[in-house]
């Protein structure tokens, strides 16, 4: 079973996206996907959406990490699961970049998504209690 954790990004969205898209970790970017943005311009896209947001918050994005036990899943399956998680969690409202890192002994996904949705420009509400239900 996968282990998942999430934390807020308050400043360096561009550096976080550069890190998760590292070609050495993602098989030359084979395991990089996105929704409603391009990985190359996601930080700018997120900023544009945030500039139109109704709520003010220090958070610019969220970084979700989904780690699998060694041998639990293959690279392609892990990436598919990461995209499915992002789609289900964000309901097609938030831009995101999902990558699968394959450079360690365990496969793991990184999902960075904009804190403001693309439709009504409302903020994502991170309620940790809801993740356990």
Language-model-detected regions and their locations in the chain:
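N-terminal nicking endonuclease/strand-transfer module with a His-rich metal-binding environment
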Residues: 1-133
């Amino acid at each position: 079973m996968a282990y998942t954790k999430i934390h807020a990004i308050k400043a360096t969205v561009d550096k976080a996206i550069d890190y998760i898209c590292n070609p050495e970790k993602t098989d030359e970017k084979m395991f990089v996907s996105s929704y409603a943005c391009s990985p190359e311009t996601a930080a700018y896209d997120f900023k544009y959406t945030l500039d139109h947001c109704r709520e003010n918050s220090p958070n610019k994005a969220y970084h979700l990490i989904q780690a699998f036990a060694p041998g639990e899943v293959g690279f392609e399956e892990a990436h598919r699961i990461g995209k499915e998680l992002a789609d289900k969690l964000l309901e097609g409202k938030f831009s995101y970049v999902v990558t699968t890192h394959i450079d360690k002994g365990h496969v793991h996904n990184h999902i960075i998504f904009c804190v403001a949705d693309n439709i009504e420009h409302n903020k994502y509400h991170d309620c940790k209690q809801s993740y356990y239900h």
